[in-house]
Amino acid sequence: MRKMVAGLAVLGSVLTACATGDGGDRGDRGDGGAKPAGMSWAYDEILDEGSLSDVLVNGADDVWAVGTVPDSTDPSAGASPGEVSGASSSDGFLLHRDGTRWQRQPMPAVLGDSVHQARLDGLGSGGLLLTAAVQDTTTSRTAHWDGKEWAALPKLPDGGRVTEMKAFAADDIWVLATLSGFRHWDGTRWSAVALPDGVTVTTLDGVASDDLWAAGFRSTGDGTDGHEMQQPAAVHWDGKAWRQTDMPEYRFPDPVPAEPSASIARVLAVAADDIRAYGTHSFNHGEGVDEPEQEAVRLRWDGSRWSKVADAEGDCAGRVPEARDGDRGLFLDDDRYVTADGACTKIARPRLPDGDGVRADSRQVLRLSAREPVPGTGQVLGVGSVQVNQGGDQTTKAVVVSLKR
């Protein structure tokens, strides 16, 4: 951990490197794809170990990042996959940039000694929520930063791990969690959200406290009637009540494959009249002959109704957005990017500099866990890790990157 923290002195270049860059991007080896023109990631900081799981940008002078470093005293730390079962212990670390430099911040005591799957959610006015799971990842804990100090958010009534969160204020927080289900925090207590019969939601997003969407699927049968077992479903909060909205249905042509279903995995609120829903129409593969291709579920709310829309083209087809790039486009998985006019490209990945334990013949994989635009600047920051494989010697380094356009 001491080595990693020592590298923070040079992290002050994060918010300026986006515009300058060094033009030295060689891409990651073994990728097999042509290098795209226009955009690439550039390393702004390389930490000695661990990984960063999330970043929150309230402004150029208020940026947070959270990550973990495996506990070197834990017997499973450093073990090869399959050698030790179960989750290992991890030390969490928190970074904050005030516009001048990055500084290490102490983790809230409420999160305990071992931190997993940490996420950051903004509250406005400099406040934020930091949520992390315990070692076995079955339960989450949340801490609230009000700009001056940390305080524990009361535990969910039935426990469980937070899988989705949308927060508008310290007294207006919506979560989806295992065991506890769909809950709302009003500043005083957690209350359960009642959903229409048969509806299950798995994703949340919204543009305002009175304009929130939750989406997933509704159960429609057991499939024995030759129809889908699930269909896409979405409910909307207008500040007073939840209301289910009608969504188009998906059907496979005859002969219908085994156990067909369609559902939403991600809802993305671009504007009040532009809500995107992404999912899959699939089935139990291998149960029949001449099976159809599964298809992408792509739906859009225009302010009055949901309609089917075409999927992205080329290598962006079938991919789900992971972050917005303002009104320019969307970041997809595996560093694909689709522009506002539908063009698909791949963001080039840099290699780590040779030296400091990294060999020139190493194979490297950059994995970003979060990307976040810097408001009002056109800049984008990303955090994650780089896995370095070199002749059986494997290491992972936490990284901060910025987008070169």
Show the residue positions of the predicted features.
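Residue-level hotspots at or immediately adjacent to binding/recognition sites across diverse folds
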Residues: 19-405
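Secretory targeting and sorting signals
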Residues: 1-24
